[in-house]
């Protein structure tokens, strides 16, 4: 957004989203708002005042007015929320690479059952702000571990591009290192650990269940890409996304597809999908469901009519509530 002093932009930074002012002269940007918070794109700049939505560990978002280098919070949407604290977590992958994330713990001493929650993208990030899913699961008694393995945004281009062409195997290394770091903090029950995620997070859930199933008691995969070959032809972004992330050689897509390795899955597996998902079409869920059921794996498929890829964020309130109920019911039965 242009202002008198430069262009305001938001930049992802280790789970935060900084608001920067880039001078027209091309000199180093100034940090307008930094620290462990997330900002949306600011509103139009008028009379020397810029308004931005800012979220942190206490609120999912407040409007903040920026004037003369100072901040004034205009709203109090999160004032009455009873949120559980977010703990920063740092781990180390076997190759020495740092892995960054967070834990949201339930109240009480534990030991608590654990959920490894994996974000989509993969070039997105979890962050410092209040996240409804982590809060719901932690409030129900589960310690939620979430982080930004290589392939995520917010840590530089090399971090984001690291997994290209070998997505499942390389992502799993960092995710398991993050889980190990969380378990080492104490108060968590490693024998009652589940894994879940949506979109790319669902891809990784299936991959981990197949290749590292001994680490988990059960899994939930949502709106996932499971078979790269059919995704390439059926997804609204398949023609470009597939080659950018999984490589130019279609012969390698089979080995990288979680569906290829589903014959190794033995743990209970819940698949959640939307019938009008054009990003990861419903056939991705159906193919995995059929393969697991034919092998006798305890598997359930929950389909939401009239919903798309964004069900968990912008679906009908009744469907979003039903989804949470199904997820908590599954963990209640298996963890």
Which residue ranges define each predicted feature?
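Peripheral, non-catalytic segments that deliver or gate enzyme domains
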Residues: 1-110, 122-140, 181-184
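Conserved beta-strand elements of the Class I
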Residues: 114-116, 270
